[in-house]
From Swiss-Prot:
<dbReference type="GO" id="GO:0045009">
    <property type="term" value="C:chitosome"/>
</dbReference>
<comment type="similarity">
    <text>Belongs to the chitin synthase family.</text>
</comment>
<feature type="modified residue" description="Phosphothreonine">
    <location>
        <position position="328"/>
    </location>
</feature>
<comment type="function">
    <text>Polymerizes chitin, a structural polymer of the cell wall and septum, by transferring the sugar moiety of UDP-GlcNAc to the non-reducing end of the growing chitin polymer. Required for mitotic division septum formation during adverse conditions.</text>
</comment>
<dbReference type="Pfam" id="PF01644">
    <property type="entry name" value="Chitin_synth_1"/>
</dbReference>
<feature type="modified residue" description="Phosphoserine">
    <location>
        <position position="358"/>
    </location>
</feature>
<feature type="modified residue" description="Phosphoserine">
    <location>
        <position position="35"/>
    </location>
</feature>
<feature type="region of interest" description="Disordered">
    <location>
        <begin position="1"/>
        <end position="22"/>
    </location>
</feature>
<feature type="transmembrane region" description="Helical">
    <location>
        <begin position="795"/>
        <end position="815"/>
    </location>
</feature>
<keyword id="KW-0328">Glycosyltransferase</keyword>
<keyword id="KW-0812">Transmembrane</keyword>
<feature type="modified residue" description="Phosphoserine">
    <location>
        <position position="318"/>
    </location>
</feature>
<feature type="compositionally biased region" description="Basic and acidic residues">
    <location>
        <begin position="1"/>
        <end position="20"/>
    </location>
</feature>
<dbReference type="GO" id="GO:0071944">
    <property type="term" value="C:cell periphery"/>
</dbReference>
<feature type="region of interest" description="Disordered">
    <location>
        <begin position="282"/>
        <end position="305"/>
    </location>
</feature>
<dbReference type="InterPro" id="IPR029044">
    <property type="entry name" value="Nucleotide-diphossugar_trans"/>
</dbReference>
<keyword id="KW-0472">Membrane</keyword>
């Protein structure tokens, strides 16, 4: 059969002699080999044609004598052991990526400088008969090229040893014993050099390479990138292989039979090179003639479809006893049984007829030769498992709508790269792990790295975050007068999604990432050569944009108005908390990319359409080391979530924190916390000591017992803020940006709310203590004396706020008791009874909260906590009524000019302090909100916050301090399903089962789209049922707590009745007073209201509250005034 194929191929080749253009096209395919005379004539013809261009000079690799000898033997068909190398082995790179690739001729003795750009032609003795020689672009030396892999410890070859990256040197000799150069990037060998060559091409001959040419649309993609118009290749083979602007990279797929790297997208080229007999056998059409392959070729969408991953003939399995050499590029099986992708939640669904080939009759007659997966041969890249997998045809068809020529799509759009990371984050460069941005011919500089951390959030929450990011990228792409942003802005932004634990990730989140092209399953492994995989990394540049998010749907779209997004999806094997995710981001990928700004977001946080850009603008000030925007509460469609009082109260709390706290702290230059849900840091500011202190919380658990530090690192973002500002010999400051905002989901149920605040309160308290104890480090920083004084004042201000918070439990009770007793003394009636009833309710709720906090989980006692919050809300209503009632009565007495005058009322300590307290809180809220120009929360959320404020003080604080020993984040590890292991052979290769056909890859893509289709928001909204053991444990704990509460209360009643305590004595005394008596009569009856010490304490606390309110009001006013003048000045 093989001889028959060869004869047919020779006959077909002889018939095509008179078609030089066709012959040239297939000169490097590995299937046709012209005679020496033909190749010499063709070479001379193209040399003359390009001579007029004047800009192309031959590039030669510098080799030592023994290397040249080995190369000569290789190109002449000898492997150095007197073994003849066949054509397929010699043309390993044929048909790979852009297949017009030229084998470089060896250097001569006269080429002793690789950077020499002379334009002389090569001597004839160095032009081999079997390899045509073409002029290549000249070489220019760039002296200030940034490092590709920073702080890498691996030894790099010098320019003399390895003048430029030679892909042929690696792929042509991967079966030889000598060492092959690294393929880390196009200029890998120059990572530590001051100069390295790059390909240069004159402006008038700049070709389009593999950059997609976009249609005319508002984003200005039709500018040809940097204003250069696309030109033809002028038959330059180097231009056909590598994009001259550097926007393509070398893929790493799998090995073929002869050890060559296989290009999955080379189906049409390989089919065109077959003889009619081979095509007829390959296509397996029994019902009609092939017609010289014309119908078959027309049925293939060039550039859209990829051939199957590793096309093997059935005979190969019986002929060989191992799978190492089971590949042939002479026979390609084309399958088209994919299920059309359609989705009600996606606009990227393909039609029934929109399959890999357009001829339905042809595809119906093709028989499947094998199943969807087969074992293929791979080779570790620098000891790491790296695999570029083709994406589904649905995505390719959608991407094709964004460009006039689908063949111009670079590899970053056609492939998804997978890496199995087997090291710690700070060892990525050392262990030869890299990212695609560093592998382009011209490595991309990253200005902005967006880090999205997620745990088990669903596709709706993840989609909200990604939609906000995509909207911001669109905004920056539209910028016309920016020196940083513009049509190429997307190339400077990398979106890094880090999921905490493979066993915890939500299946629909994986489905969403798969629909974007950034996730495929089937080849991930959890062990490589007995090294555990710590993270699975998926890289892809998607053109699919999220256009709309509803409660149940994520709408996707791909057209000429969408922008590419560079996605880096990192799936951690184990659940190791959020701080570990940030460690991967900062110490791992940020060290590789070296971004200027790193923005942190939580999955579920949706930034505004230009919020990321506005946040980035804050860093125009070179002293700004970190910044944050406004965190808003997601209020739902038409603000429906405001009907939930818990959500409304949090909305008011977030608003007032931004209006009063963030603005004031921004004026000082130190913000106590840049929320991890939406904040940004200058990478230069956090490197070194700040990050070391930030990540200490991850490793200290293995060093012993650290109660204080463990609680402190529950709010690790506060530690990072403090370390940035106090960094030795540096003058970094933190700023708040009012123009930037992001909405986030907040707890809607009481148990989740309590658990969240437990971590916040404990972490913030211990972090504040840490900053107070080390505030002296401000004076060792690089700030000027004025800034140091301001920061010192701010630390004293923060200390007083912490002091007030510490005594908030007793302070609130004192205010409550004074109000209820005062109105009972003054006006008797039912107030006497209510003062005792509410006192007992207050005590019972407080005692019960203590008992339940010590032994029960909020989820198992949700009803009790809800009841407690309701009781405290009723008591707050009564307190407000008492305040208003006493104020009204007092003014009535003043108007009547009766026994109590206005001066006497003001001099009454209790009444005066209450007025000051109310004025420094509620009146302050209203005035500052008006100044901030956002007063609407006062109308929609103020009442809910006031009613729940007693629960903030009592329930949340009590539960937090009763569980100060609980250092968890509400997460725990779980075992994920095993993925399998990889163990390489002596030659560094291994065998693995993968999806082999484009239809199977399409089916995998459709599977995840179906997961999105089957989403039922009602079923997701229902809380998950606890297990039987959890129910049993919770039941026993509840019974125990109720018994303790009942026992304590009943015993206290006996003591209170016998000793007349607990308000009973006060009630009896007030009852004996006539209703006509005034407050002065009540004082003569010697009913103690407050002791002198209690009065002093009460006055101090209230005046501190008033002073804190005044400082925040002044800070808010100054911030808005400065912001106004900045807008006027820079407009």
């Amino acid at each position: 059969m093989s001889d028959q194929n060869n004869r047919s191929r020779n006959e077909y080749h002889s018939n095509r002699k008179n078609e030089p253009s066709y012959e040239l096209q297939n000169a490097h395919s590995g299937l046709f080999h012209s005679s020496n005379e033909e190749l010499t004539n063709r070479n001379q013809r193209y040399t003359n044609q390009n001579a007029s261009m004047g800009s192309f000079t031959p590039v030669q690799s510098l080799q030592f004598p023994e290397q040249s000898q080995q190369t000569n033997m290789l190109y002449n068909g000898d492997d150095g052991n007197n073994n003849t190398i066949n054509d397929n082995e010699r043309d390993i790179y044929g048909g790979f990526v852009n297949h017009h690739r030229q084998r470089p001729p060896p250097a001569t003795a006269e080429y002793n400088d690789v950077f020499n750009t002379n334009s002389q032609q090569l001597p004839s003795e160095h032009q081999y008969n079997n390899v045509p020689s073409y002029p290549l672009p000249s070489i220019n030396v760039i002296q200030t090229t940034p490092e590709l892999i920073h702080n890498g410890s691996q030894t790099m070859a010098t320019p003399i040893e390895r003048p430029f990256f030679n892909e042929n040197d690696y792929y042509y000799n991967n079966r030889n014993s000598r060492t092959s150069p690294s393929i880390a990037s196009s200029s890998d060998g120059y990572a530590d050099q001051e100069a390295r060559p790059i390909l240069e091409q004159p402006n008038n001959n700049m070709n389009s390479g593999n950059i997609p040419q976009y249609h005319d649309q508002p984003f200005g993609y039709n500018n040809g990138y940097h204003g250069l118009q696309a030109k033809d290749y002028y038959d330059d083979p180097e231009g056909g292989y590598i994009d001259q602007r550097g926007d393509d990279y070398q893929i790493n797929s799998y090995l073929g039979r002869n050890g060559e790297m296989v290009d999955p997208y080379d189906y049409e080229n390989s089919l065109r090179h077959m003889t009619p007999m081979e095509r007829r056998e390959y296509l397996h059409d029994d019902s009609r003639p092939v017609n010289d392959g014309k119908e078959e070729l027309d049925s293939v969408k060039s550039g859209y479809s990829h051939r199957d991953l590793g096309e093997y003939d059935k005979d190969d399995f019986s002929r060989d006893d191992e799978y190492d050499d089971l590949n042939t590029i002479d026979k390609l099986q084309f399958q088209a049984n994919g299920v059309p992708a359609s989705s009600s939640v996606s606009s990227i669904g393909s039609k029934e007829s929109d399959i890999i080939v357009s001829n339905d009759n042809l595809t119906a007659n093709r028989a499947l030769k094998r199943s969807g997966t087969e074992i293929r041969k791979f080779k570790l890249w620098n000891g790491n498992f790296v695999f570029d997998s083709p994406i589904s045809k649905t995505l390719l068809d959608q991407y094709a709508t964004t460009t006039e020529n689908a063949n111009t799509l670079p590899n970053e759009f056609k492939f998804m790269r997978y890496q199995a990371v087997t090291c710690e984050p700070n060892q990525l460069a050392e262990k030869n792990f890299t990212v695609r941005q560093l592998k382009y011919l011209t490595p991309r500089e990253t200005e902005l790295m967006l880090v999205v951390t997620m745990y088990n959030e669903d596709h709706i929450l993840l989609g909200r975050t990604l939609k906000g990011i995509m909207d911001n990228v669109k905004y920056m792409v539209k910028k016309k007068n920016s020196s940083t942003w513009g049509p190429d802005a997307w190339k400077k932004i990398v979106v890094c999604i880090i999921s905490d634990g493979r066993s915890k990730i939500n299946e629909r989140s994986l489905a969403l990432l798969s629909s974007l092209g950034c996730y495929q399953d089937g080849f991930a492994k959890d062990e490589i050569n007995e090294k555990k995989v710590a993270m699975h990394v998926y890289e892809h540049t998607t053109m699919i944009n999220i256009t709309n998010i509803s409660e149940s749907e994520v709408s996707l779209e791909c057209n000429q108005g969408t922008v590419p997004i560079q996605l880096l999806f990192c799936l951690k094997e184990q659940n190791q908390k959020k701080i570990n995710s940030h460690r991967w981001a900062f110490e791992g990928f940020a060290e590789l990319l070296r971004p200027n700004i790193v923005t942190l977001l939580d999955a579920g946080t949706m930034p505004g359409k230009d919020s990321i850009y506005q946040l980035w603008r804050e860093f125009r000030n070179p002293n700004v080391g970190g910044a944050c925007g406004e965190i808003r509460t997601d209020l739902g469609k038409r603000f429906v979530k405001l009907l939930n009082p818990l959500v409304a109260s949090q909305n008011f709390e977030y608003k007032m924190s931004n209006i009063l706290d963030k603005t004031t702290e921004s004026n000082f230059g130190f913000i106590t916390v840049l929320p991890g849900a939406f904040s940004a840091y200058r990478f230069e500011a956090v490197r070194g000591q700040p990050l070391q202190k930030y990540f200490y919380g991850e490793i200290m658990e293995n060093e012993g017992f650290h109660f204080f530090s463990s609680n402190m690192y529950l709010a690790e973002d506060r530690i990072l803020c403090f370390e940035v500002v106090t960094k030795k010999n540096c003058n970094w400051i933190l700023k708040y940006c009012r123009s930037s905002y992001a909405s986030t989901d907040v707890p809607e149920r009481v148990p989740e709310f309590i658990l969240q605040r437990r971590r916040w309160l404990n972490g913030s308290f211990f972090a504040s203590v840490y900053s107070f104890c080390h505030f002296y480090r401000v004076w060792s920083s690089g700030h000027n004396i004025g800034r140091k004084l301001l920061l010192t004042v701010e630390f004293f201000y923060l200390f007083f706020n912490t002091l007030i918070s510490w005594f908030s439990l007793s302070s609130f009770f004192l205010v409550f008791r004074i109000l209820t007793v005062s109105i009972a003394l003054a006006y008797h009636s039912a107030f006497n009874v209510l003062s005792v009833i509410f006192l007992w309710l207050y005590g019972i709720c407080t005692l019960s909260t203590f008992i339940l906090s010590l032994g029960n989980k909020p989820k198992s006692t949700e009803k009790f906590y809800v009841l407690t919050c309701v009781i405290f809300a009723v008591m707050m209503i009564y307190m407000i009524f008492c305040s208003i009632f006493m104020s009204v009565k007092s003014f009535q007495n003043i108007l009547k000019n009766d026994t109590i005058s206005f001066e006497g009322l003001i001099t009454t300590e209790a009444f005066r302090d209450i007025v000051i307290s109310l004025g420094s809180t509620y009146c302050l809220y209203l005035i500052s909100s008006i100044i901030y120009l956002q007063p609407w929360h006062m109308l929609t959320s103020f009442i809910q916050y006031i009613l729940l404020s007693p629960s903030y003080i009592n329930v949340l604080n009590i539960y937090a301090f009763c569980n100060v020993h609980d250092l968890s984040w509400g997460t725990k590890g779980a075992m994920a399903n095993p993925l399998g292991k990889i163990n390489t052979t002596e030659d560094g290769t291994f065998k693995m089962e993968v999806l082999v056909s484009s239809s199977e890859i399409q089916a995998n893509y459709d599977k995840y789209l179906k997961v999105l289709n089957d989403f039922d928001p009602k079923s997701e909204s229902r809380p998950t049922e606890p297990s039987y053991d959890e129910k049993k444990t919770g039941y026993y704990a509840n019974v125990r707590s109720l018994v303790i509460i009942f026992w304590v209360i009943t015993n206290f009643i006996i003591v209170a009745v016998v000793l007349e305590t607990g308000g009973i004595a006060d009630y009896i005394a007030m009852k004996s007073i006539s209703t006509d008596d005034t407050l002065e009569t009540a004082k003569k009856a010697e009913i103690p209201l407050m002791t002198s010490k209690a009065s002093i304490y009460f006055n101090v606390i209230l005046w501190l509250v008033a002073l804190s309110a005044l400082i925040r009001f002044i800070g808010c006013s100054i911030y808005m005034i400065v912001r106004f003048f900045k807008k006027v000045t820079f407009r």
